[in-house]
Amino acid sequence: MGDRLTGLHAPTTEAGAASADHTAVVRPGFRDTAKAYVEVTKPISVGLLAFTAAAMMVVAGATHPVSGWLFVQALLAVVLACAGANAVSCYVDRDMDAQMGRTRRRPVPSGRISPPARALYWGLFLFVASLGLAWNLNPIAWITLWGGMLGYVVVYSLWLKRRSVWNIVIGGVSGGMPALFGWAAVTGEISLLPVLIAALVVLWIPNHIWSLAIFYREEYARVKVPMLPVVYELRRALNWLLLTVVLMVVFSVLIYFVGDWGLVYLATALVMGAAALALSVHIYRNPERRKAWVLFKFSSPYLAVLFLSMMVDVWLR
């Protein structure tokens, strides 16, 4: 776990001098370098957000024709956009990441991508590639993708992350943009349903991040990142966390009444929502780090299963 940090032991003078000469000529192989450049994009995070976009394309495709090429092009665009945003964010956060046990082994602080500016250039390259693909779709899709990247990198990473306790609430708006993009890529417009679904993702983000911040509370405090559970007394922070989970579940049910859904989505929203509420109430009544970890580990499957149920519901019509 993150609270078990291992130290780095200095070598003896003789061994250190000998190993210095030896390691000075060692170069990482292509495989290790490629792995580092993939890792800096946070592929698991990219996969989840891209999945929300793919699900929205399937949902929109129930009433609008979707070619295979459009689907692939849009999916590739959102993958590159999210990957680019994460790579730039890792460059911005390199000093903070180097001080946290959870993040110090990331490619930039660990030196696997060096100099650090290479992560920045890699992210910017992915930005440009994603915007080029989105431009071939339609203007609304391009704007939502551009807005999502700017929101994450500029509003969250550069501006709010180290300045405001509400960093993830405001900056989290960018997390809903892939869902909006998926809908816009197919329809060329934005309507109430995709806005509500994007809002659901935005409400999911505080639950996801704050539960992690509770578990790593001491580390966030040490690097002076004002996450709400770090700045506020824990009970007050849990009040806000529980509120966002309640709103998230309410929105998931509201989406059923706004869209043309069947019982698959409704049943999934109710069951997964009940589980999210139960875990949140559990930690609210008895605040413990391990319960925060359980809530964090549940949050990603919650979102993935909910969006999967949207696609299954459409396929079964």
Swiss-Prot record:
Top-level taxonomic group: Bacteria
InterPro entries the UniProt entry points to: Protohaem_IX_farnesylTrfase (IPR006369), UbiA_prenyltransferase (IPR000537), UbiA_sf (IPR044878)
Pathway: Porphyrin-containing compound metabolism; heme O biosynthesis; heme O from protoheme: step 1/1
Enzymatic reactions: heme b + (2E,6E)-farnesyl diphosphate + H2O = Fe(II)-heme o + diphosphate
A GO biological process held by the record: heme O biosynthetic process
Annotated TM spans: 43-63, 65-85, 119-139, 140-160, 168-188, 195-215, 238-258, 261-281, 292-312
Location relative to the cell: Cell membrane
Residues making up the signal peptide according to the UniProt record: none
MF term (GO), any: protoheme IX farnesyltransferase activity
EC number annotated for this UniProt entry: 2.5.1.141
Keyword annotations of the record: Cell membrane, Heme biosynthesis, Membrane, Transferase, Transmembrane, Transmembrane helix
Disulfide bridge map: none
Entry membrane topology: Multi-pass membrane protein
CC per GO annotation: plasma membrane
CDD domains, per database record: PT_UbiA_Cox10 (cd13957)
Family the entry assigns: Belongs to the UbiA prenyltransferase family. Protoheme IX farnesyltransferase subfamily.
Subunit architecture: Interacts with CtaA.
Remaining remarks: Carbon 2 of the heme B porphyrin ring is defined according to the Fischer nomenclature.
Cited HAMAP family: CyoE_CtaB
Role played: Converts heme B (protoheme IX) to heme O by substitution of the vinyl group on carbon 2 of heme B porphyrin ring with a hydroxyethyl farnesyl side group.
Name under which the protein is recorded: Protoheme IX farnesyltransferase
